[in-house]
């Protein structure tokens, strides 16, 4: 392997293919270092074709009964080479059932001439016939005796996560299985923590891969941010959601280098740190994958971006890697002064002195522990009974009750426990062994105690009943398996194989029963999925290292598709106490300052490579049929009626309505005022609510200077100008935005309009003093928008020689800019008749006839309609959305109901509120007491977290006297098990607790989120269970028309009766009044 020239280093960054000999194939870590020395890592992806004599499994004829617990249906939306993928969880099925489904006429691979033809059909039909993917299945198809390139036992430095931190993350440091069909897809992403990954295609149709070199990964991220601004604003690392698909045509168009390759059955694919990759399956197949790491990865892991919007994403503490393998940089790294510069061209080193020292210390202690374990095991006669019990045929498991793992529990004596019991999620191995239906699960079968291994293995050991729970989220909920799930395999799972040099002498195995009708006659069949045959001696299974995650053998979870709660399910595994001699050895061998084995607890977590999602309920061009009566109930404000001071409001708005005489001077006042308030651009104000401008001006006593000529960052993503209507190009080849993302602000010499040059489409050489907008250049002093009822603001000419607000052209989905760079002319011919007929809830009573084209709330099938400028003046939230949904619009009703605790009104003592009583019904009650409790959120070193930590639990700081620690500070805390742990402080939250009294005198303590004031709109679930009476004499005091109104099918919105109503908002009135009273004060551009 060392004869090749290393100087080339793959400068073209193309995907390389390697064919190792059997001798080269034996050492996984050495071969990975070799292929990097050849430059394979520069492509981000490499193919390895193993030797012909190597086989991971003798036959795959016996896996049809394996359960796929949570298949996902992949729904894809989008167009023009840009797509978003949503995963919807489906019911469990067996591999046999999935095979028949994949080969059915509906889901089978289409006829094609070659790969190019199949690839065209994939991208052309991506949004049709959503396929089903059997993804994220914990387990392995490798036979027990396979030592080379065993995905479940790669022996890389990633094993430190388990050995030193006691953390097993399913799919990251354990294998995952994937059963695919035609068109099942993995979207663009890098691995969690930018790790390596390995993928082996066991059998079936090929799998196509696309890869982008790591040195060009930032370019893909910038392109994705432009296409999907909504997602990028919500999470900087949104590509880790694995929902974004970008076609090769788009990549070519924007000059992003990529390569493609096809993986055949029996081949390995390896992805490298920060290598973006995506791909799809050609038909029914089965693959197995996991993550691993090398010394080169450590620097990548230290700077890897983290998803900030989902707490269940995979996080690995880099502390152990830096402390042990980079000790000279550890102190600087802890202080944030270790500046890491990644070199994507540098290959990895095979080993280092620090790694060799750590491996040697672990191997020495492991040998002593293994010898002690075997001797202790042989002295226990009750093992025979356990062995006999394991030999019994497996019955179909039924539901079992589960203890909340977050609470400490009483342990039974050591002799009452059985070996090899492990948990994964909410399932135990005893479920796979056939617990009878309705039988209670014994406490001693809920947890297994493990010791971390030394070197590259972990050893299963006996429990002593003294384990305590690991700090984790206290509100972790467990799911109960469904009794109607498919049957399981007929043999219990075993543990992973250990190193051959440490195995006890092999015992002869008796033939086990056939696993299925396809098993060979006359002899024992191949061992399926690491299952120990019933006749195998129990000693062999007991010295296997870590508990296999038994998802292949347990009932599937059939709970809701809420991915957040499912991800958080994990099992607690308690430690074993060592004897004096072994404990001394463990302490002595802990030269690197790692956690003592006797105190380490193993925690199993669930990772989801394909997170669940919810697709949009309608297309961007759809128009929901308007329900006038419903809108009138929700919005009584007409723009001039139903207000406390009609004359004041009429004077504020009269000059700008189109049914009044045009006033160019009034428009100048609007534009001039807008130029002095954030965001200083009459077009960017679309995504900047009025309330923000009002608050800014109230907080500032000094009038801000003019911003004309300054460079600021536009709020309107370039995609918003291009994705409307029939545009097929998502982004223009160039725009007037600088390399730093800023654009100059320019002001019209006549109408005082101020805009970004890029937003209005002005070439840089024309952005200077004396510039005039299109409307003033045409001397169209009375120009008005053809899509709304308000004058003023930034206008552009249409193809029909009319005028249109630029913000109206952006927000109305059918409108498109013919010249995207210059933002004109604008084509409105594609607007459907249904949209022209929609009535604006804000101005329909003011205007004598329906005019303009309305937009609608984006929330599901909400039919609330309004003109763009009316909605903006009313404070309706509008935000950038992902392609092809240009703008996300949330009406005031759904904004209030979806904001959660952020918009909750203050509840005072003595106030009448509505809450749920113990009988499940909702009643009126009175608040008689209130208190507040402060909780801290912290992240532990092993990646777990807690968001309900009491301040007094922190021991390294007197939080009750000094307050919370600074964000990001390392603290020491005492957990519920009495032990001290280190964690990083994240944030502080205060929860309000209320004491309420019902009409019958009963009292209840409830949280603020469970209380509804009389002014709030009641959710449907509350209205359906709202009771007018508790059967007490005090009923009349709480009855009335307002209570009866709450029982109507649709309740009048809070917006019609409180100051949240746009027309009655004091902030809204004062802001609008400021527009006309004096020039130079902040105002609202239209």
Swiss-Prot record:
Cross-referenced SMART domains: JmjC, JmjN, PHD, TUDOR
Function of the molecule: Histone demethylase that specifically demethylates 'Lys-9' of histone H3, thereby playing a role in histone code. Does not demethylate histone H3 'Lys-4', H3 'Lys-27', H3 'Lys-36' nor H4 'Lys-20'. Only able to demethylate trimethylated H3 'Lys-9', with a weaker activity than KDM4A, KDM4C and KDM4D. Demethylation of Lys residue generates formaldehyde and succinate. Plays a critical role in the development of the central nervous system (CNS).
GO molecular function annotations of the record: histone demethylase activity; histone H3K36 demethylase activity; histone H3K9 demethylase activity; histone H3K9me2/H3K9me3 demethylase activity; zinc ion binding
Alphabetical list of CDD domains matching this protein: Tudor_JMJD2B_rpt1
Family membership: Belongs to the JHDM3 histone demethylase family.
UniProt entry tagged with the keyword Kinase: no
Feature: compositional bias, Polar residues: 585-597, 1026-1037
Biased composition, class Low complexity, residue ranges: 512-522
Domain writeup: The 2 Tudor domains recognize and bind methylated histones. Double Tudor domain has an interdigitated structure and the unusual fold is required for its ability to bind methylated histone tails.
Binding site for 2-oxoglutarate: 133, 199, 207, 242
Predominant localisation class: nucleus
Positions of Zn(2+) binding: 235, 241, 307, 309
Name of the molecule in the record: Lysine-specific demethylase 4B
Annotated region described as Disordered, given as residue ranges: 379-536, 575-624, 1024-1043
A Gene Ontology term for the protein's cellular component: pericentric heterochromatin
Tudor domain ranges (all copies): 905-962, 963-1019
Positions where N6-acetyllysine occurs in the chain: 599
Root EC class: oxidoreductase
Record's subcellular location: Nucleus
Source lineage: Eukaryota, Metazoa, Chordata, Craniata, Vertebrata
Bias (Acidic residues) ranges: 441-450
Sequence ranges assigned to domain JmjN in this UniProt record: 15-57
């Amino acid at each position: 392997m060392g004869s090749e020239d290393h100087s080339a280093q793959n400068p073209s960054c193309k995907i390389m293919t390697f064919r190792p000999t059997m001798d080269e194939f034996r050492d996984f870590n050495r071969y990975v270092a070799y292929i990097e020395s050849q430059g394979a890592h520069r492509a981000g992806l490499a193919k390895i074709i193993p030797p012909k004599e190597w086989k991971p499994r003798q036959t795959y004829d016996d896996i049809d009964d394996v359960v796929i617990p949570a298949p996902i249906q992949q729904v894809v939306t989008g167009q023009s080479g840009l797509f978003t993928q949503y995963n919807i969880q489906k019911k469990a099925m067996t591999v046999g059932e999935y095979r028949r489904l994949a080969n059915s006429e509906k889901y089978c691979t289409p006829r094609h001439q070659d790969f190019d033809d199949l690839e065209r059909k994939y991208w052309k039909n991506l949004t049709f016939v959503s396929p089903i993917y059997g993804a994220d299945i914990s387990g392995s198809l490798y036979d027990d005796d396979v030592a080379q390139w065993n995905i479940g036992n790669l022996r890389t430095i990633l094993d430190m996560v388990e050995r030193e931190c006691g953390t097993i993350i399913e799919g990251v440091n354990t294998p995952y299985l994937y059963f695919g069909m035609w068109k099942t897809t993995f979207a663009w992403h890098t691995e969690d923590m930018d790790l390596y990954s390995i993928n082996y295609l066991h059998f079936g149709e090929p799998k196509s891969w696309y890869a982008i070199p790591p040195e060009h990964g930032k370019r893909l991220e910038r392109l994705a941010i432009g296409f999907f601004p909504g997602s990028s604003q919500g999470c900087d690392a949104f590509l880790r959601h694995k929902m974004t698909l970008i076609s090769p045509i788009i990549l070519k168009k924007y000059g992003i280098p990529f390569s493609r390759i096809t993986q055949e059955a029996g081949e390995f694919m390896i992805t490298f740190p920060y290598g973006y990759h995506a791909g799809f399956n050609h038909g029914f197949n089965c693959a197995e994958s996991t993550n691993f790491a090398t010394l080169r990865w450590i620097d990548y892991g230290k700077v890897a971006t983290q998803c900030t919007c989902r707490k269940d994403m995979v996080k690995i503490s880099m502390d152990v890697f830096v402390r042990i393998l980079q000790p000279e940089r550890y102190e600087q790294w802890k202080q944030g002064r270790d500046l890491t510069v990644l070199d994507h061209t540098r290959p990895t080193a095979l080993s280092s002195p620090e790694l060799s020292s750590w491996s040697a210390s672990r191997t020495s202690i492991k040998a002593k522990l293994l010898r002690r374990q075997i001797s202790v095991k042989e002295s226990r006669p009750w093992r025979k009974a356990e062995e006999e019990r394991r030999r019994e045929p497996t019955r179909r498991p039924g539901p079992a009750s589960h203890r909340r793992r977050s609470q400490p529990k009483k342990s039974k004596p050591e002799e009452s426990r059985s070996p090899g019991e492990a948990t994964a999620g909410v399932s135990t191995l005893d479920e796979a062994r056939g617990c009878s239906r309705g039988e209670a699960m014994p406490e001693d079968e809920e947890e297994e105690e493990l010791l971390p291994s030394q070197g590259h293995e972990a050893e299963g050991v006996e429990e002593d009943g003294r384990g305590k729970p690991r700090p984790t989220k206290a509100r972790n909920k467990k799911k109960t398996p469904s009794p109607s799930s498919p049957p399981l395999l007929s043999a219990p799972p075993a543990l992973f194989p250990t190193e051959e040099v440490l195995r006890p002498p092999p015992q002869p195995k008796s033939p086990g029963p056939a696993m299925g009708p396809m098993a060979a006659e006359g002899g024992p069949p191949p061992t399926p999925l690491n299952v120990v045959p019933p006749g195998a001696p129990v000693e062999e299974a007991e010295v296997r290292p870590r508990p296999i995650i038994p998802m292949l053998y347990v009932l599937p979870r059939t709970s809701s598709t809420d991915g957040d709660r499912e991800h958080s399910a994990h099992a607690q595994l308690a430690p074993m106490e060592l004897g004096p001699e072994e404990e001394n050895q463990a302490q002595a061998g802990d030269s690197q300052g790692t956690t003592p084995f006797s105190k380490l607890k193993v925690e199993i977590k669930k990772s989801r490579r394909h997170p669940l999602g919810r697709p949009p309920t309608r297309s961007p061009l759809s128009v929901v049929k308007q329900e006038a009566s419903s809108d009138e109930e929700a919005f009584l404000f007409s723009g001039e009626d139903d207000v406390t001071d009609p004359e004041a409001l009429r004077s504020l708005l009269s000059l700008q309505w189109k049914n009044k005489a045009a006033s160019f001077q009034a428009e100048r006042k609007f534009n001039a005022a807008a130029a002095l308030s954030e965001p200083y651009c009459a077009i960017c104000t679309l995504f900047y609510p009025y309330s923000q401008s009002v608050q800014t001006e109230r907080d500032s006593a000094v009038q801000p200077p003019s911003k004309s000529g300054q460079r600021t960052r536009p709020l309107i993503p370039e995609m918003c100008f291009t994705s409307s209507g029939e545009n097929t190009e998502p982004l223009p080849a160039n725009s007037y935005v600088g390399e730093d993302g800023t654009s100059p602000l320019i002001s019209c010499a006549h109408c005082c309009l101020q805009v970004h040059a890029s937003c209005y489409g002005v070439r840089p050489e024309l952005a200077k003093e004396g510039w005039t907008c299109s409307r003033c250049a045409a001397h169209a002093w009375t120009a008005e928008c053809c899509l709304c009822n308000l004058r003023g603001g930034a206008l552009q000419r249409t193809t029909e020689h009319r005028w249109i607000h630029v913000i109206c052209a952006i927000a109305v989905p059918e409108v498109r800019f013919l010249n995207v760079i210059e933002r004109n002319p604008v084509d409105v011919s594609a607007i459907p008749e249904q949209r022209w007929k929609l009535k604006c809830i804000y101005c329909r009573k003011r205007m004598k006839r329906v005019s303009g084209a309305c937009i609608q709330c984006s929330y599901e099938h909400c039919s609330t309609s309004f003109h763009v400028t009316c909605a903006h003046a009313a404070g309706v939230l509008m935000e950038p959305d992902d392609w092809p949904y240009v703008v996300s619009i949330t009406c005031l009703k759904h904004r209030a109901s979806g904001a959660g605790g952020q918009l909750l009104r203050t509840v005072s003592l003595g106030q009448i509120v509505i809450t749920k009583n113990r009988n499940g019904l909702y009643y009126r009650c009175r608040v008689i007491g209130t208190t507040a409790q402060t909780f801290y959120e912290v992240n532990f070193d092993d990646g777990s977290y807690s968001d309900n930590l009491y301040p007094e639990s922190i021991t390294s700081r007197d939080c009750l006297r000094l307050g919370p620690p600074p964000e990001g500070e390392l603290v020491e805390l005492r957990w519920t098990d009495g032990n001290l742990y280190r964690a990083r402080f994240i944030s502080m939250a205060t929860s309000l607790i209320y004491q309420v009294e019902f009409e019958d005198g009963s009292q209840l303590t409830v949280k603020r989120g469970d209380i509804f004031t009389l002014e709030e709109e009641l959710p449907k679930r509350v209205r359906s269970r709202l009771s007018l009476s508790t059967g007490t004499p005090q009923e009349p005091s709480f009855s009335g028309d307002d209570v009866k109104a709450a029982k109507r099918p649709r309740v009048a919105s809070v917006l019609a009766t409180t100051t949240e109503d746009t027309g009655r908002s004091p902030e809204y009135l004062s802001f609008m009044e400021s527009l006309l009273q004096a020039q130079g004060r902040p105002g609202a551009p239209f």
